[in-house]
Regions:
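Conserved N-terminal beta-strand and adjoining loop/helix that marks the start
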Residues: 1-17
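Conserved Nudix-box catalytic region and its N-terminal flanking loop in Nudix hydrolases
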Residues: 12-52, 56
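Short aromatic/basic micro-patch
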Residues: 29, 80, 105
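Active-site-adjacent beta-strand/loop module that shapes the phosphate/pyrophosphate-binding cleft
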Residues: 68-94, 125
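NUDIX/MutT-family hydrolases
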Residues: 87, 95-126
Length: 132
């Protein structure tokens, strides 16, 4: 079994979670991405969020939320994504980068347009009554 190691930023506003859709895709993903060689989770998170949304994560505000594993969306069976999720504040104005078609605040009504691992995260946030 192959695992794709990723980190994600859980940004909640008005009981909804920030999600992004890459250009050419129809599925939304929680912002974040794969680590580069030698990076810590926080370094990866800061870099990926700056690249995708042009904001600066406030490192001192970052808190671990949980790790979620599911079939990788769009990959062959047996390829799994392991997503380490963090909550944290930011500075700046959210702006979709050139690789991001749009960002959107999603609720439980949007469960059909998100990836497999994101569904597990959504269910956890719903159970904790963090999103609705």
């Amino acid at each position: 079994m192959k695992y794709i190691d990723k980190v994600a930023w859980l940004l909640i506003k008005d009981n909804k979670i920030l999600s992004t859709r890459s250009k050419g895709k129809d599925t939304f993903y929680i912002p974040g991405g794969k680590r580069e060689l030698g990076e810590t989770d926080i370094q990866t998170l800061v870099r990926e969020i700056k690249e995708e949304l042009d904001v600066d994560i406030i490192k001192e505000s970052v808190n671990y939320y949980g790790t979620f594993t599911a079939q990788s969306h769009g990959d062959i069976a047996g390829v799994k994504v392991q997503m380490k999720c963090y909550l944290g504040l930011y500075e700046g104005t959210l702006t979709a980068s050139s690789e991001i078609a749009e960002y959107r605040w999603l609720s439980s009504d949007d469960i059909e347009i998100i990836s497999h691992v994101d569904k597990l995260i959504f269910f956890s946030l719903l159970k904790s009554e963090i999103i609705f």
